[in-house]
Curated annotation (Swiss-Prot):
Residues 422-444 have a biased composition (Low complexity). ATP-dependent serine protease that mediates the selective degradation of misfolded and unassembled polypeptides in the peroxisomal matrix. Necessary for type 2 peroxisome targeting signal (PTS2)-containing protein processing and facilitates peroxisome matrix protein import. This is Lon protease homolog 2, peroxisomal. Residues 19-366 form the Lon N-terminal domain. Gene3D superfamilies: 1.10.8.60, 3.30.230.10, P-loop containing nucleotide triphosphate hydrolases. Residues 416-465 are annotated as: Disordered. Signal peptide: none annotated. The keyword ATP-binding applies. It catalyses: Hydrolysis of proteins in presence of ATP. ATP binds at residues 667-674. It is an enzyme of class 3 (hydrolase).
Amino acid sequence: MARYKNPKSPAKLKQQIVLPTCKLDSNLVLLPGIIYNVTFSRFKAAALLYRYKDLVSQVSIINNLLNEYEFNPSKDSDSVEEDDMVTSPITISKVAVEGIEQFFKYEAAFKNSQGLVSEKDIAEVAPSNEFDWLTLAIKPNLEKIKEPSNAQIDPTEHNSVVTIARIVGIVDDTTNIKLTLQAITRGLKIAPKKKTRPNEQLLEVDWSSDIPELRRHFKSLKDSSLDLFKVIDKFIVDYRQALSINSANGNKSNLQITKPGSRYKGANGSSQKPGDLLTLNPLANALYLQLAGSKDFSKAFLSLQKLYGQFASDENLKVDTKSYLRLLDLTCGILPFPNHEKLKLLHKISIDDRGNELINMINQLIKIFDTLDGNNSFVNHWFYNEATNIQKANVVANQLKSIRLLLEGMTNKTRPISNRGNIKSFNNSENGNNNKTNGSGITSRRPKSNEDGGEVYDEEDDDEEDDELRAITNFIKYKLPNITTLSPDSKRLIIKDFKRIRASSQSPGGGGNSDFHVIRNYLEIVMDIPWDKYVTKFKSNKDIDLNFAKKQLDDDHYGLEHVKKRLIQYLVVLKLLGINAEKQISDFRKENQVPSPSSSGSNLATQNSLVPASSIVIANNDETSFAHKQAQNKVKTSIKESNIENQTNQSIQVTKYNKSPIIMLAGPPGTGKTSLAKSIASSLGRNFQRISLGGVKDESEIRGHRRTYVGAMPGLIIQALRKSRSMNPVILLDEIDKVIGGSSGVNKFNGDPSAALLEVLDPEQNTSFIDHYLGFPVDLSQVIFICTANEPHNLTRPLLDRLEMIEVSAYDYNEKLIIGRKYLLPRQVKRNGFPASDRIEEFVNIDDASMKKIIVDYTREAGVRNLERKLGTICRFKAVEYCEGLSGKSFYNPNVEEADLPKYLGIPYSSGDFSSIETTISNNSRVGIVNGLSYNSDGSGSVLVFETIGFDKRVGNPNSSNTGCSLVMTGRLGEVLMESGKIGLTFIKSLIYKNLIQAKEQPDDKYLIEKFNNLELNLHVPMGSISKDGPSAGITMATSFLSVILDKPVPADVAMTGEITLRGLVLPIGGVKEKMMGAHLNGNIRRMIVPRENRKDLIEEFSRSVEEAGDVVDSNLMNELLKDNEEADFKMDKVEKFYLKRYGIQIFYAREFYDVMKILWGEDDLLTKPKSNRILEYHL
């Protein structure tokens, strides 16, 4: 809606648009080119922003503010008066939306030009930012702007121009709303041909700026402004000098009186000037406070001086019309001109008139400073040279008397009784009937009734209370009654504390007592908790996008399909509950004929006649009485509807019945547990908070301290809710196994924090979690708690029982290769300063051989933390080479080959792993040398060699008696591991004494018994500085003992793990996958012996590996594998072939120790007695 007024002249471009309007409550005059911070009441800011709600729906701070109020706009918007639009706002019209779009186009063209805009410069540009839509016309409040004679501004002369501004910032200080307004240009009101809404105005915007004799105009403005700057600088210097003189003289007395015309000597003998009365001049004080009393003004004034200084220092600097127009408004807006003068300049549409008016204002201000200087010189001369001491004393006394009267007038100033009565009665009509109202009858979400047993505080505001107390009052009056998650008893306790703080503030001494500050801090914290606020990416649960959530999880993490599957199941349940709840609400409304929320608002205005006149008694005029009746009518109607809504809310609460999962991610460090929790929050669109529990040893850190203690604060859970600003965040309880307490046996003087977590992490109890500081239950059922632990079995049994544990196992070589190439390397390339690009190979290219060597030789871990650290090191080296290539010193090669790794990463680490294949000087003997498998504390697996050497006591000592076999074990072995060795030796002894085995070429039955009784065994496990423990090396040590006794070597390519019993049974162990990866990385292991009962673990890991590879596992195949596994001799070997192909290791299973002997030495007839088919009486 734009047109040219003068199509013959391209520079004369004018635009006619319709824009929303807003009248300020203060006397502020907005001049174009300046950014203003304007404070609005929360209600008026909400009413203003409500008009744009369809255009700024994604701005969270606006949505949060609008959620505090429920506006009921009238359908017949054209018939509503403008004042009613403030209390019953409606969204802006389509014409106003088009006006904002057209204004944005012309504004963009004006910014890109040198001040001359033509039709060809107008491009099709749409607002890109949601704040671009917050464009409005600001109308000055003429009632608040006074002339020097204390008369109001004539509205007929100064009501035709508005300031077109844009809201560029919003700050919520819990009491008021501060809007940052960027004043853009002027708009001239014109009479519309078609009727517009009362809060919208047809405006004419003049974008033309053709100024004849621009340089002459600018020279006049520059000269006048520079003269004013000199006068201002001189005044500030004189005033500060007067302050310093009076301050120095004030060391002896309040006012130094010297003899006329004399100069006096100071204490140090220096000559000083007499005092200066400039600081006693009210005009001087007012000017100084405006010029130097504000940092914001000082900063703006210096910027204005710099702008003029640029043109003053360079006469040849080109002055364009845009700079000239900007200087006009900036000069008037920054300098201390009164508001009525600024209003006159705002209404100067003609640029020539605007320039002349500003120069006249500047010259008038210069005269004021000159007059002030002359008057001050006269007074100083008379006071210090001609006045007698009595006259001086009278002057000082009159000054003090005037100050005292002024202070008394300020402190005793009260509102007229008639006005106070009107306001009080109107507030009572809004708030005195158990209903939250704002403005003129704007009702809240539900009435403030006490039908639910709660107590409602309903006392009028006190204008003289501080802002913090006023914010608490607004919370108690307006928000607390509508909080659905608080019980009536909890609300009653909060209101009781609020009444105590109000009584303390009104008692003698004010808020000086300790209880006042303690309760106020408590109420501020209660107010800061985000009650009934739920943040999510989706508008409702039925709109949950499962594909998006799955894609988000896949993009952030590779594999971990079992974790992702559990989260997708949770989202599916939420989606179904949302669909069911909506259907239940719809059916309920049809059965009970409940009107929809959109139609209920129109019924309120038709029932005014139903309210009896005697129900409200007000001793005020008819207009206030009518408003009172209207509010009372809305109260009764809303109470009637609330009875029906209480039943519909039961259907709405169906969604909340689904308890959020409480998950524990257990696994070694560096496997992505913490980052997975962040990804979960991102996929759900919820806020994320991390609580580190490592080293927490006080129960009060979880539950909070009681208010009786000094410095008491809520616990970590409530603090996380406050930081997240929602009641349904994703809270990560990191390192929950590091909590000090539980089974650790520490002193329980400060309580057990792990016991405090029992209530938090129990879905059946956390709906009413009580923090000691708050003292009332808080609903945590919608919070998703995700715990992480490295050693989950360190947790107490009750706490572990409450958690849904999901194991995040160690990554194998193939997974690390994919993770490093797809996730870690691109992230390190970006973090180390390389240009953004989709092809990272152009900057750092690591081939598979080099990546494998980094994984195997430079990192030995279960996770990928050290792998990312090594990739970061390589990227930093390549960044140096890339910069040298940019400077032309050398050619940049992005490739990283295996031979380059020592240059970047140094010498590969010594793995410490070796196997029995290593040769020794003892004829390369492998007797007694057996490869075991260990699960390390960092979550990785490795090969652990067990060495046993036997000595016959009879050699060199023929008289040695059969004292029995002795055993010495070294290598920093733990108690459980040493017991396993003793059990293994006892089992071997039982085989020998029962004659179940025989030595090769020694048919004598007593040979092995005599050898065993005269044998001295020494078992050692290398890497003696590392502690080792656990029962899984039972069959390994037993095999080592038997190898020495039979003098039979053990194959070097075999590794084994399993717990042994005294009967020779092989029991299952843990960490099979990690041990298999350790054997694979060793490089020398080709066969692996595991307990037969661990095959089901390998089947589960097989299924998980197939899913993470992107393939679909056939459910029939899994059923067949599990059914086949129940047989003693399984027939399906698909699992074993999978691991053979993936790791190059053939898996064997052992139910009893005889299976181990058979795998190692085969069907050796000399090994067992011919008559004995099995070595045990007990068979599985």
